Amino acid sequence: FGIYKISSTLFNKQAGKIIFLICFLNPIFFGHMAMNPKDTIIAFANIWSTYILLKYLQNQNSSNKRKHYVLLAGLTIGLGTGVRIPFLMTLMPLLLFAVVDIFFTKKITNSKFSINKFIVDLIFVLVIAYSLTVFAWPHVHGNIFTEPFKLLLIQLKSSFGVPWILFDGIFYETDKLPY
C-alpha cells in the first residue's frame, strides 16, 4: 500500500495501481519474505519515510499538516533506526532527493517553501527518532548520550558485507583482500 501511495504522489493513481501490482506480484518479494524478520520492519519504515517526506515537501505551509508529518517522520525513522542503525544510510537518497527538489527542480515543493522551517523540522524529526532509537536499545539506557555513539563507532569499524571472498582462486577475509 505504501508503494501505491508513493507512486500516486509522484505520478498519478493509475500509475500507482500498476506499480503496486508489479511489486505485489513480483516472485522475488515472496521468495525473500521471512528471511530476516528485521528486514520487514526496515522496508516498512523506509517506504513510509519516503511517503511522509513527499507529503511534508508538498504541505510545509500548512501548520497542522507540517506538525503531523514531522511527528510521523520521527516515528518511522525512529522505528527503522531502533531496529537497525544502518537504516540511516538508506535515508541518504531521500535527503539527496529533498535537497535537489528544494534547491533546483521544485517539482514537489512550492515557491513558499521555507528552508528555515525545514531545518527546524529536521531537528525535531531527529530528536524524536533518536528518542525512539534509545528507547528500543535497553543496553544504552545507562547513558543515553554516549553509549549509542560508542555502539555506532564499533559498527563502523567492522567490515560490511560477506566475511570471506573468493579472489583469484583463493579465499580471503573481506577486510584483508589484497589490492
What is each PLM-predicted segment?
Residues 3-12, 50-53, 57, 135:
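Transmembrane-helix signature of membrane-embedded glycosylation machinery that interfaces
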Residues 19-24, 31, 51, 77, ...:
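Short helix- or helix-capping micro-motifs
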Residues 34-41:
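Short acidic/glycine- and proline-prone juxtamembrane loop motifs at membrane-interface regions
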Residues 42-50, 72:
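Hydrophobic core segments of transmembrane alpha-helices in multi-pass, intramembrane catalytic enzymes
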Residues 79, 97-113, 118-179:
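Transmembrane-lumen/periplasm boundary regions of multi-pass, lipid-linked membrane glycan transferases
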